[in-house]
Structure formats: C-alpha cells, structure tokens
Regions:
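Short, amphipathic alpha-helical "recognition" segments used to contact nucleic acids or chromatin
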Residues: 54-69
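Charged, often Cys/His-bearing segments associated with DNA-binding zinc-finger transcription factors
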Residues: 1-53, 215, 299-308, 313-316
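Residue-level marker of regulatory loop/turn positions in helix-turn-helix DNA-binding domains and
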Residues: 53-54, 249
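Short helix-loop boundary/capping segments at the starts of domains
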Residues: 23-27, 67, 92-95, 99
Length: 316
C-alpha cells in the first residue's frame, strides 16, 4: 500500500511526512486522552491496550484513502482490522495533514496557510499570481433540507463545492481552499473571501485571472489582468483578429493555474467527493498541501514573455 501508485507520494516524501507528523500525532492523541481523563495519567506510560496499527500504517491508510477514494471497508479488509478502526485512523491523521499549509518554492520549512500569507509572500518575493476557481461534485442533499439549491452549479448543473486556487507563473500551487457553495459566482467570492481587500493592502501584487473575475480586473486595472471583452458583431476583421490574439496571449499566460487544478483532480475525492460535506474542507486542504510539497520541488525557471516582437526592424 505504500507504493506511490496507491498513496500518491514518493517513498522519500512518505519518509519526510513520517518524521514531520508522528510527533504531532502523538501530542494530539495524548492531549485528547488528557481531556477525557480530566487530568494527568494515573497508570505508567505504556500501560493499557496497545494500538493495532503503527503510525506508518495509519499514515499510509489515510494517504491511500485520499488518493484513490478506497472505501473504509476495503481498507479494513486489507489490514485485517474493523471499519471503525479505519474511520478513527483517518479522523486522526487527516486533520494533521490539513493543518500543514502549502509549501513555498525555494523556501524549505516555510508554509502558507491563508490568502493573506500568499499575498504577503508574493509582495515580498515579487511573484506574479494566477487565480482560478475549481468545482468538485458532491452528494445531493436530502429533499426539503434548507439551502439545498445553494450547491447547484449554474455551469455544471450539478451539486458542487467551489474553491479558489492560487499558483505562481509555473503552476506551482501556493493556495487552494476558501470553499463556497457551487451556486456562488466567482466575483461574489472575491468580496466574501477578502481577495479584493488583499489587492488593496498589497498594491504591488499582480495577478492573471479568467473572465469570471473580470469585475476584479475592472476594480484593479493596474494589478489584475483578465481576458479582453469580445468586440461587437459589427466590428471589423482587424479588430476581431486583435481580440483573438490578445485573448490567446492572456490564456497562455494563465494556463499554469489550470495545470495546478488538474493536479488536484488526479486525486479521486477532488473529482467526485462522496463523503460527508462537513469533511470536504479538511480533505481538500490535506490533498492540496501534499500536492504543493511536490510542486515546490520543481526548480524556478525564467518567465518567458508572450508579447509580440517584430522579426525585422522596419524603422530603418
């Protein structure tokens, strides 16, 4: 089960996660026992029932569940334990993975956990950001439940949850989260998530967005670049060609964030989430943090310009 095809991470990455997360898991478990006891332990250290699974097994089980969407019953049969043990294992390890945040390229040990952290990092390092929204299909709520229509996406005509993805110009994931119901438009999320406020606080940060964030580009024309509006039907051929070329260059510059979203969809729960809706945010952040670890290891390369350059100087 520890093979990368099952757990989605390399063996080196798995070893790093074991070293990083095992102390946090032990502290979390001991804190829970202390709260249940209402005080310090009464018996000697090591007394009481022993764990059926080591932390290595627990981490691998959680990674396999996140990567493949394998059911808890199937994992219980593979490890010869009960389904409740698997459920408790995932419930203990998944929050620790979700709390890790997002790795930063060329900055080992530094993690980003909020949109404010991302904008502060981009401002300090001069990083150009790319923003996009992502949708994940979720289960349909029961009939008669309040707010049932809030999750029906106008684009996909399905029950979805939307999130915001932020990457650099190489498609390396810097942030993914800020979940919202699928019916909410991207421009509405700009106001509710505080993205517009971050652009006001960091006027030197620039970003490339799609047409869903065109209102943000209108509010911050010097910072945000969105696809140009299509000319009217009676526009001349030259104007239409100029519009198509401008749209192509802008799309080419921001395609990297689409690649970051594609990396997320390689994990089964990000294609269709079948679990409880209140655990989606935790699952999403855990998966996105693991993807950012791998993306941060990609070396930084020079950002090529998409501007047109004349092949011959015609001014002479």
């Amino acid at each position: 089960m520890s093979h990368p095809a099952f757990c989605g991470v390399s063996r080196q990455h798995l070893g790093d996660l074991l070293e990083e997360l095992q102390p946090k898991w032990r502290a979390r478990c001991e804190g829970g026992r202390h709260a249940r006891r209402g005080g310090a332990r009464q018996r000697q250290l090591g007394a009481g029932p022993k764990y059926q699974l080591t932390f290595h097994d627990r981490l691998v089980i959680t990674l396999v569940h996140l990567r493949t969407g394998l059911t808890q019953e199937a994992l219980a049969a593979a490890y010869r334990v009960s389904s409740s043990t698997i459920s408790r294992t995932i419930g203990e390890v998944r929050p620790i993975l979700a709390e890790r945040g997002f790795a930063v390229p060329d900055r080992p040990g530094l993690r980003l956990r909020t949109l404010q952290d991302v904008f502060a990092y981009a401002s300090a390092e001069g990083v150009d950001l790319c923003l996009d929204g992502a949708e994940t299909q979720v289960r349909r709520p029961k009939a008669g439940r309040p707010g049932r229509q809030a999750f029906v996406s106008g684009k996909r005509k399905q029950n979805t949850i939307k999130t915001t993805t932020v990457s650099d110009h190489q498609g390396r994931l810097l942030f993914s989260g800020a979940q919202r119901p699928g019916r909410m438009h991207d421009q509405t999320a700009v106001r509710t998530e505080g993205i517009a406020e971050q652009f006001r606080r960091y006027p030197q940060v620039s970003a490339k967005v799609d047409s869903g964030y065109r209102g943000l580009a209108g509010e911050f024309p010097d910072q945000v670049t969105a696809p140009p509006k299509k000319p009217k039907d009676d526009a001349c051929e030259g104007e239409m060609r100029a519009w198509r070329e401008a749209r192509r260059r802008q799309s080419s510059a921001r395609i990297c964030v689409e690649h970051a979203n594609a990396e997320l969809r390689q994990w089964a729960p990000m294609r269709r989430f079948t679990g409880r809706r209140d655990t989606y945010d935790q699952t999403h952040r855990a998966i996105a943090g693991l993807i950012s670890d791998r993306a941060a290891q990609r070396p930084t390369r020079h950002q090529h310009s998409t501007e047109l350059v004349l092949a011959n100087d015609t001014t002479r």
